[in-house]
């Protein structure tokens, strides 16, 4: 790509995230606990003085050049283009842009690469003079993903990558988006390994329908005694959301107390609920979680929306390398991401 020689290059880098606990509750009024990871996305942007955006990446297939006001095309570049269209509405930019994306985040691994691309693009084009906070950018990124991309996600991923710093967890109350940044204890090691689709929308719709039938705004607030009015599938989804909301709150307490054993136990309970009630795990992930714990992890669980992808494990640093070697011996195709 070529841009006018006098055009200024703007860049921004944001981390990916792993959700330690609090799955499927960011749109149900629960508290979530994502942690920023070192793998990151960097976006470089330069005005090209045309009416087209030209977007490229070494990690994602196919560069794209498209008119600045074109609709989404179901291409990875839509995440960049949605952010650029938002920026034009805010009068942050006007002409077409040359954009290059460098990503160390594995695609489809449940690490929020889409949210990271949108937030990084917004940060790159945000004028220094704009009174726009990172929280504002997170809300804008969610709106872009909901409306331009068409994914009915919650706010967790955008807040995590906009505000998070590697080595800290974000205790986020999704009712009002109040949050607390918590340092991860030095005696804890979080490891993520990798082994999406319309099923996310289906599970989300089931949660919303369960809340409607029970008569509550937030499913996390539902009384477990009222699950009898739901059919079996909706009752299972509600049971997970209610119990996961309580686990997340307990996990924040355990993190503050540096109680690794309790935190790990909550992770295991979370995975079991995601497997049995939310029905978003798969046999290969279940075995990986079981082996991770069998070999000495305090806890492990599937992370992200589910249906494969990644697990996250809590491991004593003193046994980390031996534990990883033994787990790799049982599952040769896994990759250690962080």
Functional labels for PLM-detected ranges:
Residues 36-39, 111-131, 312-315:
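DPxDG-like acidic metal-binding loop motif
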Residues 55-56, 96-102, 132-143, 265-266, ...:
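Beta-strand segments within the central parallel beta-sheet cores of soluble alpha/beta enzyme folds
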Residues 131-187, 300-303:
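Alpha/beta catalytic cores of group-transfer enzymes, especially the acyltransferase/condensing modules
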Residues 29-37, 203, 208:
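Short Gly/aromatic-enriched secondary-structure transition segments
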Residues 8, 27-29, 65-73, 103-111, ...:
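A short glycine/serine-rich beta->alpha loop
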Residues 84-109:
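Glycine- and acidic-rich phosphate- and metal-coordinating loops
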Residues 2-17, 42-78, 86-89, 93, ...:
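C-terminal nucleotide
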């Amino acid at each position: 790509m070529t841009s006018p020689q006098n055009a200024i290059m703007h860049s921004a880098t944001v981390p990916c995230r792993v959700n330690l606990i609090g799955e499927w509750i960011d749109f149900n009024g629960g508290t979530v606990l994502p942690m920023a990871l070192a793998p990151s996305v960097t976006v470089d942007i330069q005005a090209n003085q045309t009416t087209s955006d030209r977007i490229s990446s070494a990690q994602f297939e196919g560069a794209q050049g498209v008119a600045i006001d074109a609709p989404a095309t179901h291409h990875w570049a839509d995440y960049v283009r949605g952010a650029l269209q938002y920026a034009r509405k805010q009068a942050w930019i006007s002409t077409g842009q040359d954009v290059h994306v460098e990503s160390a985040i594995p695609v489809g691994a449940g690490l929020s690469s889409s949210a990271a691309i949108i937030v990084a693009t917004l940060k790159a084009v945000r004028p220094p003079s704009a009174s726009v906070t990172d929280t504002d950018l997170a809300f804008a990124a969610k709106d872009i993903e909901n409306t331009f991309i068409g994914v009915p996600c919650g706010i967790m991923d955008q807040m995590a990558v906009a505000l998070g710093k590697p080595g800290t967890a974000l205790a986020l109350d999704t009712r009002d988006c109040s949050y607390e940044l918590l340092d991860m204890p030095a005696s804890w090691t979080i490891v993520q390994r990798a082994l999406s689709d319309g099923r996310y929308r289906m599970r989300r719709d089931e949660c919303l329908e369960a809340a409607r039938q029970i008569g509550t705004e937030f499913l996390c607030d539902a009384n477990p005694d009222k699950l009898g009015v739901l059919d079996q599938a909706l009752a299972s989804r509600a049971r997970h959301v209610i119990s996961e909301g309580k686990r997340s709150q307990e996990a924040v307490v355990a993190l503050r107390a540096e109680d690794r054993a309790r935190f790990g136990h909550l992770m295991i309970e979370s995975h079991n609920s995601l497997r049995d009630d939310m029905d978003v795990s798969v046999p290969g992930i279940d075995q990986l979680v079981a082996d991770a714990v069998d070999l000495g992890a305090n806890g492990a669980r599937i992370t992200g929306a589910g249906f494969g992808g990644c697990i996250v494990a809590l491991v004593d640093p003193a046994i980390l390398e031996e534990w990883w070697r033994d787990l790799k011996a049982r599952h040769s195709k896994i990759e250690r991401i962080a």
